[in-house]
From Swiss-Prot:
Family per record: Belongs to the PRA-CH family.
UniProt cross-references to InterPro entries, sorted A to Z: PRA-CH, PRib_AMP_CycHydrolase_dom, PRib_AMP_CycHydrolase_sf
Taxon lineage: Bacteria, Pseudomonadati, Thermodesulfobacteriota, Desulfovibrionia, Desulfovibrionales
Biochemical pathway: Amino-acid biosynthesis; L-histidine biosynthesis; L-histidine from 5-phospho-alpha-D-ribose 1-diphosphate: step 3/9
One Gene Ontology term of the molecular function aspect: zinc ion binding
Domain of life: Bacteria
One GO term of the biological process aspect: L-histidine biosynthetic process
Name this protein carries in UniProt: Phosphoribosyl-AMP cyclohydrolase
């Protein structure tokens, strides 16, 4: 079996982690993971990330209840990017209330909202 350990040494201890809906293939979000976040994700079966702005680990959905249940974890060929195939519980991955953090789209020079808004952040993050 091939080693399954991200290379956290390439970028100062952090690697990008992409969360993708395991059923639909929709890209939900990108966040950062350090070794501790990766270990907690594997241990608990729910996504944990590292917040660069707060300088600490965070459990996705710990405040909102919009957790990400891990179905599978993949590493890219260089072991410096993580892909999480998830079941998005609660309906939204984005702290702005949208299903996906990639909710804005530019097509033919026009910008539009392309992901449904699931909740009002003012009501969830009081």
């Amino acid at each position: 079996m091939t080693a399954f350990v991200p290379d956290f040494g390439k970028a100062g201890g952090l690697v990008p982690a992409i969360a993708q809906d395991a059923d639909t293939g929709e890209v939900l979000m990108m966040a950062w993971m350090n070794a501790e976040a990766f270990e907690m994700t594997l241990k608990t079966g729910e996504a944990h990330y590292f917040s660069r702005s707060r300088g600490r680990l965070w459990h996705k959905g710990g405040t909102s209840g919009h957790t990400q249940h891990i179905r599978a974890v993949r590493l890219d060929c260089d072991s410096d990017t993580i892909l999480l195939l998830v079941e998005q519980r609660g309906g939204a991955a984005c702290h702005e209330g949208y299903r996906s953090c990639f909710y804005r789209e530019m097509k033919d020079g026009e910008v539009s909202i392309c992901s449904p808004k699931v909740f009002d952040p003012k009501e969830v993050y009081k």
